[in-house]
Amino acid sequence: MDIRILIDKLGPITNSEITLKPFMVFTGESGLGKSYTAFLVYNLTSALTAIRMQEFVEQKVKGNKLELDVKFKDFRLWLNNNTSAYLGYLLGYSDFSCHVNYVFDLDDDMPLHVKCLDDDETTSFSRCSMNGKTEVFPMHLADQTLLMSITLNKYLAEKIFNQPYFFQLLLPPARAAFIGSNTTTPIGMYREFLRQFDDLKTPSRVASPDIQLYSNYIARLVDGKIVVENGNIFIVFESGAKIPVSAAASSVKELMPF
């Protein structure tokens, strides 16, 4: 699917348009707005996670906590109208303002009907219907807006990205100084990065069959392997040399997922 972002005003960028691709590189001199453009991609992927989707759901359900009945246009307008606030959060600048428009190859009138289904006889799972199709979750979620958010974000992510779930990643500029620190920061992009970094350091209780595949790709990319020792992440090269990730963190200036 083509996803276009029409930029009327975004920092130094005016009257421009970009089409999102699976891999994009923004190059040029400092001050051209490369970081702002990359943040637009992160804004979209983060909007398709349950946490931010819950903001949309809570705004639309009103008094009915069990059912959401909107159209895709409602989500698209919410995304466009909240871009300034979210980029301001990432930048730590509450007065940040921009004018952009996300355009999708989806019908604006596509129905988005989400409904929580009551299960009075069991507390071991939850059910929610998405446009009439029942989704079953192997857990009991008392927060019904969260349940609807998870259901809706899975549906829209599959429509937009052709995959129901994904792990978003944010590598902001000058992040190396924050690795290993115990400080907090009001700047959203560093808070997001540190949260994701902590998640990556935490070992999973369930072994994934894809781990070796990913490990092989990482080894090819960095000519070595990633190891975790005493809660710290290191890159170990084939020569045996080892450096902490904090020392290599700025070798890739900035990265956003798509």
Predicted regions and their residues:
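P-loop NTPase switch/coupling surface
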Residues: 1-195, 201-207, 237
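Short, well-ordered loop/turn elements at secondary-structure boundaries
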Residues: 20, 164-166, 221-222, 229-230, ...
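GG-anchored amphipathic helix commonly corresponding to the ABC/SMC/Rad50 NBD signature/C-loop
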Residues: 41-44, 240-242, 247-258
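Secondary-structure boundary/capping signal
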Residues: 49, 225-226, 256
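Amphipathic alpha-helical segments that form well-ordered structural scaffolds
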Residues: 170, 213-217, 257
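ABC-family P-loop ATPase nucleotide-binding domains
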Residues: 190-236, 245
